């Protein structure tokens, strides 16, 4: 693999285009100003990406498969060229949106065979993206979370201090306090209050410790004592009357495109769900990446009352495997919240039509949808999302057809999700623990004899 730093510098120097601006949403009414923050995830930079006549050699991340239709902003068989990542961040910079902070939920390196990377190469990729963000947003507070690819070998994030943990702690020092840096070095997680929102706390979890492929943490009930730390942190926040946003890479709950598969080990998923239910009165939102798709989840308590809203953001990378027919257009998103109590009010999803951008040779990031307007709901509170999910479950639901289009970031609106496909989605949206999830499938089986 070519030297990552040199190639990135070369790509940056070659950049001349400016992305088109999306449609900013001005706060309405005479109430207090609406708070805003950006969420970006899964950049997956592939520095080997280049245009060549041999489509099997366009990028290392295609693993020898032919690129589909490679252009300046990438290809669906490849991870992101630097130009795509820069266009996303430059769009954010020039969008006209005033924000308090940004969350970045991990995965900077490409999907390549393990021997094509190393600890130093992984750190170098993370450093390249970190310095790009810091250069474009010198005065913006950014809260990162580590992804399963932000380590080498991938997925094997440890429970003790490591070279990667030390490296990201040093890279992210401009954004974080000394206390946050200390726990980041120890276990890859941290907490910190938002500087201009004194009663809002960010908790950045290292959920990669619970990820199935992580053999380092196999059979450990509380890797790196993160559960104990999380409960202590939430307990103190509760006493101090703070609100909390949870950010992480690997999400809780079940994957919406397969039956019975949770993104993390079931024991750890159940433990996290128990903690989130216990402190749902102060957790004002949860934000994840990892799946590359756009999805929502609603956490209910054991009596079935919706108590938490969860959002999985789509990736910037458009990559798909040879076994997949569909993928996502690149996306970034903007959340709006009430600055008085930090309740989530709305979300604006922006995207880049990759085919169009490659044809025109310039990026034109656009507003894909505004969540409350698209679904005619009041806000992003658990009650509103739960009601929306109930509408999704209706047969021939136009709302669900729209949701599934957005699931792939408007990559292919002709695809229909029905039958088992729809059941997978509905059960995953509304049921995050094993008992309710299993019961969801049982009810559908009895009703539809599937």
Swiss-Prot record:
The keyword Iron does not apply. The keyword Kinase does not apply. Its cofactor is Zn(2+). GO terms for cellular component: extracellular region; extracellular space. Keywords: Disulfide bond, Glycoprotein, Hydrolase, Metal-binding, Secreted, Signal, Zinc. ATP binds at residues 111, 148-149. Zn(2+) 1 binds at residues 42, 44, 107, 292. Disulfide bonds join 59-78, 417-421, 427-440. Its EC number is 3.1.4.-, 3.6.1.15. Binds 2 Zn(2+) per subunit. It is an enzyme of class 3 (hydrolase). Gene3D superfamilies: 3.60.21.10. InterPro entries: ASM-like_Pdiesterase_prd (IPR017064), ASM_C (IPR045473), ASMase/PPN1_MPP (IPR041805), Calcineurin-like_PHP_ApaH (IPR004843), Metallo-depent_PP-like (IPR029052). It comes from the Eukaryota. It is found in: Secreted. Cyclic-nucleotide phosphodiesterase that acts as a negative regulator of innate immunity by mediating degradation of 2',3'-cGAMP, thereby inhibiting the cGAS-STING signaling. Specifically linearizes 2',3'-cGAMP into 2'5'-bond pGpA and further hydrolyzes pGpA to produce GpA. Also has in vitro nucleotide phosphodiesterase activity with nucleoside triphosphates, such as ATP. Has in vitro activity with p-nitrophenyl-TMP. Has lower activity with nucleoside diphosphates, and no activity with nucleoside monophosphates. Has in vitro activity with CDP-choline, giving rise to CMP and phosphocholine. Belongs to the acid sphingomyelinase family. This is Cyclic GMP-AMP phosphodiesterase SMPDL3A. It comes from Bos taurus.
């Amino acid at each position: 693999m070519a030297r990552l730093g040199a190639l990135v510098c070369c790509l940056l120097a070659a950049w001349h285009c400016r992305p088109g601006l999306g449609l900013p949403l001005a706060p309405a009414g005479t109430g207090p100003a609406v708070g805003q923050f950006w969420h970006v995830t899964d950049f997956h930079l592939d520095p080997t990406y280049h245009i060549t006549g041999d489509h099997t050699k366009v990028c290392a991340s295609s693993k020898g498969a032919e690129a589909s239709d490679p252009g300046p902003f990438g290809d669906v068989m490849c991870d992101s060229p630097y130009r795509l990542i820069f266009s996303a961040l430059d769009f954010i910079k020039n969008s006209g949106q005033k924000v308090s902070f940004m969350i970045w939920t991990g995965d900077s390196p490409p999907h390549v065979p393990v021997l094509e990377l190393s600890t130093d190469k992984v750190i170098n990729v993370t450093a390249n993206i970190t310095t790009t963000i810091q250069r474009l947003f010198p005065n913006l507070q950014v809260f990162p979370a580590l992804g399963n690819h932000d380590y080498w070998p991938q997925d094997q994030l440890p429970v003790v201090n490591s070279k990667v943990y030390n490296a990201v702690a040093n890279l992210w020092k401009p954004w974080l306090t000394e206390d946050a840096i200390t726990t980041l070095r120890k276990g890859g997680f941290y907490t910190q209050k938002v500087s201009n929102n004194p009663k809002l706390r960010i908790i950045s979890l290292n959920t990669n410790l619970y990820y199935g492929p992580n053999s380092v943490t196999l059979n450990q009930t509380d890797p790196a004592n993160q559960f104990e730390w999380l409960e202590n942190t939430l307990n103190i926040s509760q006493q101090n009357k703070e609100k909390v946003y949870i950010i992480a890479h690997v999400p809780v709950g079940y994957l919406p495109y397969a039956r019975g598969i949770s993104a993390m080990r079931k024991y750890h998923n159940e433990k996290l769900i128990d903690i989130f239910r216990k402190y749902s009165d102060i957790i004002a939102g949860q934000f994840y990446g990892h799946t590359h798709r756009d999805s929502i989840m609603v956490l209910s308590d054991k009596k079935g009352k919706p108590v938490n809203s969860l959002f999985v953001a789509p990736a910037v990378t458009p990559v798909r495997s040879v076994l997949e027919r569909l993928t996502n257009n690149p996306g970034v998103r903007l959340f709006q919240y009430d600055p008085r109590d930090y309740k989530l009010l709305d979300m604006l999803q922006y995207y880049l039509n990759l085919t169009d951008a490659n044809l025109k040779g310039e990026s034109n990031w656009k507003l894909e949808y505004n969540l409350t307007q698209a679904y005619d709901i009041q806000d992003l509170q658990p009650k509103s999302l739960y009601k929306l999910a109930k509408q999704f479950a209706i047969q021939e639901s136009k709302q669900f057809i729209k949701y599934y289009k957005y699931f792939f970031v408007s990559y292919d609106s002709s695809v229909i999700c029905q039958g088992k496909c729809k059941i997978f989605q509905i059960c995953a949206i509304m049921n995050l623990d094993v008992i309710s999830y299993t019961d969801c499938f049982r009810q559908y089986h009895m009703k539809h004899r599937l």
